[in-house]
């Protein structure tokens, strides 16, 4: 895209291009947060950079000048500046870190996940503060460069810092690409919990011709793994489908056909609803392994607990405020969903915050030729703007 063409673009497209031009492959930030902080500082935000190990985080806050009970409200935009690697550059039609507009679509790594959302948040906030400088409550930003990586030094560390200071978030919009066919058609009002395990089941190695001298760990493991795959963990509920157990890796053997291996290693994951806890899952899995009298070691990884922001039958509910914002911009009713993977919302929700995810369409995320509709980004600015208005310009505390 030429400089002349860039000058003709709207504010949200220009900012998205600026952010996308920075190769912030996780955990790098590549100056994205500095750019955002500069824009926010001009609006009266106080910026705090929180650096943990290799991760850069930004906590930015603008407080109300009013002294009313509504000013206890803290509205947060949350997101990440890091992106996944571009992969094979030969498969891209355009360079992944040279944003290009073709037929109304903005192409480049991070277009949908989630630098387009970050640009829309900033532009919406600029417009809102200009129109409503005396708004109620506080507007905050929680931005990390460690969402696509191991999620160790990112949002979770920022939340720990805020909790230690008793600094709370009331309502949070995570800008993950939640939409499916059109911007705003899907809002994620929760996510399933995720728990993973690596189990190493021991046997006795030996020659296949002498079965009396071996204990085949593959034979020993398969009945237990089969039983785990057939467990009806729960029936789900109004917000979540039934819990899912999936084996993702099984490894055993030396590569020789005449050697019984000494152990088998299996990886599995459960995506679970609010009907279960991680402790219940651990106990049930290990009881099944014990029932089959296996000699095993198991390592658990707790990726995040399930969370839900429930719909409240009130015109002042947070979900209603978001839904009305979408309706006013797109003319369509949004649908609520808890499907898909995890997000950093799982670290924010346990503090008591009401958390939703709202962003552009997700059809091309993590793929080559990732893209986002320019028109959708314009609409997303309007949606975020109306969310701010609906939450911070009412004189009634929303539920």
Curated annotation (Swiss-Prot):
Please state the pathway this protein functions in, per its UniProt record. Amino-acid biosynthesis; L-lysine biosynthesis via DAP pathway; LL-2,6-diaminopimelate from (S)-tetrahydrodipicolinate (succinylase route): step 3/3
Cofactor(s) of this protein:
Zn(2+); Co(2+)
Which molecular-function annotation in GO is an example for this chain? succinyl-diaminopimelate desuccinylase activity
Q: Does the keyword Transcription apply?
A: no
Annotated residues that bind Zn(2+) 2 are located at 113, 148, 366
Reaction(s) the record says it catalyses: N-succinyl-(2S,6S)-2,6-diaminopimelate + H2O = (2S,6S)-2,6-diaminopimelate + succinate
A single Pfam family it belongs to is: M20_dimer
Q: Where does Zn(2+) 1 bind?
A: 80, 113, 176
Q: How is the cofactor bound?
A: Binds 2 Zn(2+) or Co(2+) ions per subunit.
Q: What is this protein called?
A: Succinyl-diaminopimelate desuccinylase
InterPro entries per the record?
Bact_exopeptidase_dim_dom, DapE_proteobac, Peptidase_M20, Peptidase_M20_dimer, Peptidase_M20A
